[in-house]
Amino acid sequence: AEDGILCVLVKMPCNLAVLDMNAADSIPERFSEVTDWYIGGHSLGGAMAASYAAKHTDELDGLVLLAAYSTADLTDSGLRVYAAYGSEDGVLNREKYEADRINLPQDTTETVIDGGCHAGFGNYGAQKGDGAPVISAEEQQQQTADALAVWMNLQ
């Protein structure tokens, strides 16, 4: 938001994106002045965002995956894709993450947040099974926001 990016957080039933996968449908009509649309999410929310993106490639410009992967084939979608995870993430299934890279466009930008963990992308506290972060959640989120601003050509 500091870089002029409209950020819309969509409230999900029980905080689970899987319970309302099409919640983003009504967002563009509420912000008609916006011309470039990206969808993204963290963990399961990222996986659901990827599934949504695969079905709405004509309406979106890109996808942001935070500690998430896409099971949907986006290789020829025309979408820009940014993926990030923390080096200390103990929740993300790295084998599945690596295996599902095949579903992303070849020019996908990937960032590993050094010292970051799974929960560091959010504001919900420690998560069972996660690694011990070396940086604060605030630092992880700032690094992510800065990297996204560069990726979106805003800096």
Describe each PLM feature range.
Residues 51-61, 70-71:
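Conserved hydrolase catalytic core segment
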Residues 40-49:
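Gly/Ala-rich beta-loop-alpha elbow adjacent to hydrolase catalytic centers
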Residues 77, 83-85:
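Short beta-strand/loop motif that positions the catalytic acidic residue
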Residues 11, 64-67, 84, 114:
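Alpha/beta-hydrolase-fold catalytic nucleophile elbow
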Residues 7-9, 81, 110-112:
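Conserved beta-strand scaffold positions in the cores of enzyme catalytic domains, especially
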Residues 2, 85-139:
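Active-site-adjacent alpha-helix of alpha/beta-hydrolase-fold enzymes
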Residues 1-36, 128-129, 133:
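Serine-hydrolase catalytic machinery in alpha/beta-hydrolase-like enzymes
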